[in-house]
Design a protein with these regions (language model features):
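N-terminal small-residue-enriched
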Residues: 2-542
Length: 542
């Protein structure tokens, strides 16, 4: 990847597109199918070499990672990049310790050498280890395959069609009053072949898609400007997500529109331009206590930061302390029946939900994915773990949470989809709002900060509206809600029903050293929180 491309990707926060040994290719090469027969030969060669060298366990990941991104601004195409990265990662246990090595030499000798290198690393690690690796058992999968259920492969869509869509989005925003408009499209295809000495040969074809945009309105007299980002979620779907199906739209109080499993980016861009312009003259929020009605387009990030991350077992145990901190949610709290939220609060971990970013058939340890409870009726009941962590919790199986972002990266525990279950009683957003006397209605991801134990945080929003006497009234600016994680989730007094359930997500979630990125969804229905402190972010002490 050249310097210009690197800088553009970094500025977009899309470092996850910059995989090792990425080569730039023509768009047509994105359509070359995976060579499953070759992958099987390479995997078997690595397994045989590891066994011959004394490994008690070995797994092999043959990965082909395809990335395409298109970047536009107003009527210009700024960049189109197609990238491919192919290689093999070999992980072993020898003398009770882990070892890992990787290669992009796609020959039997090349992968056998990587296996032997992994053995040497494991034996070196064993000399310093104070305990042996304990792997939870896994049911061998045999020879299986899994595909993201897509209707239209984004890689098959001509670049010209993608460019036309993005330029239409920009034009729609500009025609509706925006001064600037920038849109991007990210399409990712992970072709992953996993084999292990347990007896699994798993071929997976995984697709993800995201169309983010930002529109800007400027007050030329004062120089003041305001932005509004797109409200479309990143998804584990094909290009069909961008068809704008009217049946997937949610018409909400205040004339707002939200999107389910289909996204009309042009329509959203028109609304964004008008709302960015309205934000220029919106009054600043009055700080104080409010009842909050939070849309899934905002709440997903709060779930991600205050529930998903603190319940990663490696973070709980302190293994992530150098990078984004630890967790207040220590294992003794689970054992004591710690109250995480009100009895309405149920958090579900899931690696199977169709359309979600985290959906796969098997994780990167060959564990079949599933759904399980993290918080049940407000009580902390479980965490997220991998095969070598399960025994710490007294569990007999992994949760299927292992992931590596590239063939050259070692797999480790990553967050599954974590969602707040919808309410069990019929309730729509209009009725929820009607019951609020003094509140705020919050949409879209804003700026945020959270402490090193995932306990104290604050979150802003793209759009914040006042609620007075059961009605959505005016748009306000400069608001952010403050939380202490348990207090915040214990303030939940109502959750809309399943008909309002929607996914948000993080397309580039960072973790680990060296850093890796993963993609993860978080779903919820619109949720009410009572008596939450809201600050004015524009105020200064002076």
């Amino acid at each position: 990847v050249d310097r210009r491309t690197f800088l553009q990707l970094s500025a977009l926060g899309a470092g996850g597109l910059l995989l090792p040994s990425t080569r730039l290719i023509a768009a047509e090469q994105l359509l070359v199918p995976a060579d499953t027969a070759r992958n099987r030969r390479l995997a078997d060669a690595a397994l045989a070499a590891a066994k011959a060298a004394g490994a008690s366990y070995c797994d092999v990941r043959v990965g082909r990672y395809l990335r395409q991104f298109v970047v536009t601004r107003e009527a210009k195409v700024e960049n189109v990049v197609n990238g491919e990265s192919i290689g093999v990662g070999v992980r072993v246990i020898a003398d009770g310790a882990w070892g890992f090595a990787a290669t992009n030499t796609l020959t039997s000798d090349g992968v056998a050498n990587a296996a032997r290198q992994a053995i040497a690393i494991a034996r070196a690690n064993a000399r310093m280890a104070d305990r042996r690796v304990e792997l939870a058992p896994v049911t061998p999968a045999g020879t299986v395959s899994w595909r993201t259920p897509i209707k239209r492969n984004a890689m098959e869509v001509p670049v010209a069609e993608k460019v036309a869509l993005l330029l239409d989005v920009n034009a729609a925003a500009m025609n509706a009053g925006a001064d600037f408009a920038a849109s991007r499209l990210f399409a990712i295809n992970e072709q992953k072949y996993f084999a292990s000495s347990d007896g699994s040969w798993i071929d997976q074809d995984i697709h993800r898609l995201w169309l983010p945009f930002t529109v800007t309105a400027v007050d030329k007299a004062s120089g003041k400007f305001r932005t509004r980002d797109g409200l479309g979620a990143p998804v584990g779907m094909g290009y069909e997500y961008l068809d704008g199906d009217a049946a997937q739209k949610h018409h909400l109080p205040g004339g707002l529109i939200a999107y389910g499993m289909s996204y009309d980016a042009r329509e959203d861009a028109v609304a964004a331009a008008k709302q960015a312009r309205a934000k220029l003259s919106a009054p600043s929020v009055k700080p104080g206590k409010y009842d909050l009605v939070i849309d899934p387009s905002n709440l997903f990030l709060t779930i991600h930061e205050s529930v998903g991350h603190p319940l990663e077992l490696d973070r709980v145990l302190g293994y992530e302390a150098n990078y984004a901190g630890t967790s207040f949610a220590t294992v003794d709290k689970r054992d004591a029946g710690f109250r995480w939220g009100s009895p309405l609060v149920n958090f579900v971990a899931d690696k199977t939900r169709a359309g979600s970013l985290g959906a796969v058939g098997y994780d990167d340890e060959g564990v079949k994915t599933k759904q399980w409870d993290l918080v049940r009726d407000g009580i902390l009941v479980d965490y997220q773990c991998t095969r070598d962590q399960a025994h710490i919790l007294g569990k007999t199986e992994s949760d299927g949470c292992s992931y590596a972002d590239a063939w050259s990266s070692v797999q480790f525990q990553r967050m599954p989809n974590v969602s707040l279950a919808a309410g069990k009683q019929p309730l729509d957003v209009a009725k929820m709002v009607a019951g609020v006397e003094k509140g705020l209605y919050i949409h879209g991801r804003g700026s945020y900060s959270i402490d090193q134990q995932r306990y104290n945080a604050q979150f802003g929003g793209q759009l914040i509206y006042e609620i007075e006497h059961g009605k959505v009234t005016r748009l306000v600016e400069d608001g952010a809600y403050q939380i202490r994680t348990p207090e915040f989730w214990n303030s939940v007094s109502a959750i809309c029903d399943e008909s309002d359930f929607r996914l948000g997500g993080s397309f580039f979630d960072g973790k680990g050293q060296p850093s890796q990125v993963s993609a993860v969804s978080h779903g919820s229905a619109t949720t009410r929180f009572d008596g939450v402190n809201v600050i004015n972010t524009a105020r200064s002490l002076g």
